Amino acid sequence: LNGAGIVHDTEVAMVGRTSEDVGAVLGTGEFGAARETGEVVNEAISRGAEKNIGLGQAVGEYLLEKNFPYNDMSLLTSAVRLNVPVTVHVAVGTDIVHIHPSADGAAIGKTTYQDFKIFCRIVSDLEGGAYLNIGSAVLLPEIFLKALTVARNLGHTVNNFTTANFD
């Protein structure tokens, strides 16, 4: 996922839907300024940094801990329950949670870097498999290419695979 994915997943867990009409609030300076989403995501990231875990796991665990009413609809809570890694690749400044007072750039960087390392391990086992890029035509394809390079440079055979971009 990219950073927007965790924002939307958090909103779904909290209230059962995403919550903002961008067009209605962009001109007023309110875009991305919802207090609750920023506080929840940034607290989850800070805790994840303290625990040395990835951003996806950190948010999933935090949502479960808070027992939000729609956690059953959350990709991240489901991933934690099933012990399936969901990696989150953030570009600082691109997500609404980065403009909140609780945003901690060091924690964001630490947790998203943990996820990059996890993603590299996953890509190193991609031989004969498929990579589906969903929702990011710019950032995530670049992350994939870097992870593929890391895997190959570490001696993993990753030549026979299929990719598809859904954006």
How would you label these PLM feature ranges?
Residues 1, 87-93, 115, 120-143, ...:
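Glycine-rich anion-binding loop/nest that anchors nucleotide
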Residues 1-3, 75, 86, 147:
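Buried hydrophobic positions in well-ordered alpha/beta secondary-structure cores of metabolic enzymes
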Residues 8, 21-83, 87-88:
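Ligand-binding beta-strand-loop-alpha-helix segment within the catalytic cores
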Residues 9-15, 98-102, 143-146:
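Short acidic, glycine/serine/threonine-rich loops at helix termini
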Residues 14-24, 104-106:
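A glycine- and small-aliphatic-rich helix-loop capping segment at beta-alpha/alpha-beta transitions
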Residues 36, 50, 54, 70, ...:
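Conserved active-site and cofactor/substrate-binding residues in soluble primary-metabolism enzymes
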Residues 78, 122, 150:
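Hydrophobic/aromatic ligand-binding patch that stacks against planar heteroaromatic rings
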Residues 83, 87-101, 105:
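Active-site rim beta-loop-alpha module in soluble metabolic enzymes
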